Regions:
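Mg2+/Mn2+-dependent nuclease catalytic core
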Residues: 165-256
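Basic polycationic patches enriched in arginine
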Residues: 22-24, 32-33, 37
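Residue-level detector of structural "landmarks"
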Residues: 12-16
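Extreme N-terminal basic, low-complexity initiation segments
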Residues: 2-9
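Metal-dependent nuclease catalytic cores that hydrolyze phosphodiester bonds in DNA/RNA
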Residues: 38, 44-178
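Alpha-helix boundary/capping motif
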Residues: 9, 20, 30-31
Length: 256
């Protein structure tokens, strides 16, 4: 009999291993029961089975985010700094955005914008709690959708991540800018700044210039304050229909 106190994939497999060792004459029966047990586990139980280790190599300070005249700013380490997103928003060409709003209509464009932001926040909550090894559940329709989006990111995007230095990390470049990145850790053996993004549809490389600039700015800030040598940035994108994409910035592209 398989006995599992707090069922997760790892506890089920561990118990199954012990049972198979005791009953070598009936492995197929046990394996079938293990598969049935795994299928009975919901996605939330998978989401709490984080295998990413905490590494305290870097010590991060917690910044306070505030709005000033509609712009996001940070109060961190004695500095009051504009956010990276605020700077990018004020310097980018908004021609396409204006055309999109004109095509969709102001009301519909605002609805899509709000929906996307809410979906992104929900997906981030699942991912943050997964990294920290905490349980999190949102039983709303939106929460159930973003649970599966987060699971896709975990299965594909976070699989190469062996350790993390910090989750939801406030980063700042003294006197210039600040921001919050989703994860800093070891990705495929390299110190990496990682950002999670939701998207309404798959992205093309040429559409994500701001994502790249944002991630690169975080890497520069990390190196400046913590004396690190961030080797790459990885941007993990997932759509509501679970299409996953990954964009990397490294080498000269990260430093230029």
């Amino acid at each position: 009999k398989l006995t599992v106190g707090a069922p997760t994939i790892h506890t089920v497999l561990a118990e199954a291993g012990k049972t198979i060792a005791r009953r070598r004459n009936a492995p197929l029966t046990i394996i079938r029961r293990v598969v049935e047990r795994l299928l009975s586990l919901n996605v939330m139980e998978v989401l709490t089975a984080s295998m990413i280790k905490k590494n305290d190599k870097y010590t991060y300070v917690q910044g306070t985010r505030f709005m000033d005249h509609g712009a996001r700013n940070y109060d961190v380490a004695g500095y009051r700094l504009p956010s990276v997103t605020t700077i990018l928003g004020r310097t980018k060409d908004e021609t396409y955005l204006r055309q999109w709003i004109a095509k969709k209509g102001k009301e519909e464009a605002e609805r899509i914008k709000t929906q996307s932001a809410t979906r992104g926040t929900s997906m981030h909550k699942y991912l943050e709690n997964y990294v920290l090894g905490k349980g999190y559940e949102d039983l709303t329709e939106l929460g159930q959708l973003t649970k599966h989006m987060a699971q896709k990111v975990i299965e594909v995007g976070l699989a190469p991540v062996s350790e993390y230095f910090g989750s939801e990390v406030t980063l700042y470049y003294p006197g210039l800018y600040a921001g919050s990145t989703d994860l800093v850790g070891i990705h495929n053996g390299k110190e990496t700044v990682m950002d999670f993004k939701q998207a309404n549809r798959p992205k093309r490389e040429e559409w994500i210039g701001d994502y790249k600039l944002q991630a690169a700015a975080y890497a520069m800030a990390h190196d400046q304050v913590h004396g690190s040598a961030i080797e790459q940035c990885v941007i993990m994108v997932c759509t509501p229909d679970l299409y996953y994409q990954e964009f990397k910035i490294d080498g000269l592209n990260l430093r230029k």
